[in-house]
């Protein structure tokens, strides 16, 4: 069992958006120094796009700075094998309206046996991981 927490775009939005209803909880979660984190380039891309299009370039730059400052963060690249696994996840959960990024994340969560996901998206619990 992997003790790392998988970070989804929702947790980045919550921690950096003071008006977000989960902001205080997200700040508390990131205050847990003992937690190793995992996310993917797909999640980072999705998060950067969200901040850029909703709050502008400076907000997207702030996200990039926040992510760069996370010591102990593992960022997963994307391979053709990851793409194939993502397609299998999309087929497996057909009807759940999963985005490609969420399906890729579910694939990595299962592959790496990650039991904890920091997210605001219930879809990332489809494989049994706990959503915080």
Model regions and ranges:
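Active-site neighborhoods of divalent-metal-dependent phosphate/nucleic-acid chemistry enzymes
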Residues: 73-117
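Active-site phosphate/pyrophosphate-handling residues
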Residues: 10, 42, 104-107
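A generic structural signal for short hydrophobic patches within well-formed alpha-helices
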Residues: 12, 44, 124-125
């Amino acid at each position: 069992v992997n003790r790392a927490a998988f970070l989804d775009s929702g947790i980045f939005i919550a921690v950096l958006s003071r008006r977000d209803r989960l902001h205080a909880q997200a700040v508390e979660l990131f205050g847990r120094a003992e937690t190793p984190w995992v996310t993917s380039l797909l999640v980072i891309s999705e998060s950067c796009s969200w901040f850029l299009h909703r709050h502008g370039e400076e907000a997207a730059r702030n996200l990039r700075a926040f992510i760069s400052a996370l010591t102990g963060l593992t960022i997963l690249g994307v391979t053709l094998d990851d793409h194939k696994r993502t397609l299998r996840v999309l087929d497996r959960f057909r009807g759940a309206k999963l985005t490609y990024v969420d399906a890729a994340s579910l694939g990595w969560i299962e592959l790496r046996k990650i039991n904890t996901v920091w997210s605001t998206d219930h879809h990332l619990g489809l494989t049994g991981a706990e959503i915080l």
